[in-house]
Amino acid sequence: MPTTYELEFDHADMVAVLAKPGDAIRAELNSHQAHLLHTAIGISGESGELLDAIKIHCIYQKLLDRANVIEELGDLEFYMEGLRQGLGITR
């Protein structure tokens, strides 16, 4: 039996009405906004990769892949510096 939530919302219709297609999003971004979005997405992605490396060590008791952690931290620094520059923020 469907829940009240499922009866009230048709997710396919909601997405069709509310979600912007990628071309529309891209067309609305100027160069500065695209840079900010790119660097923020990069931070998010690299954070997830760092979290996964730490999770594997802590939860699954695997040897910490220090080289990977160092690489992910470097990647985070890269995107964070790009975002700082894009926002005019200094360290």
Named regions from a protein language model:
Residues 1-91:
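Flexible "arm" and connector segments at domain edges
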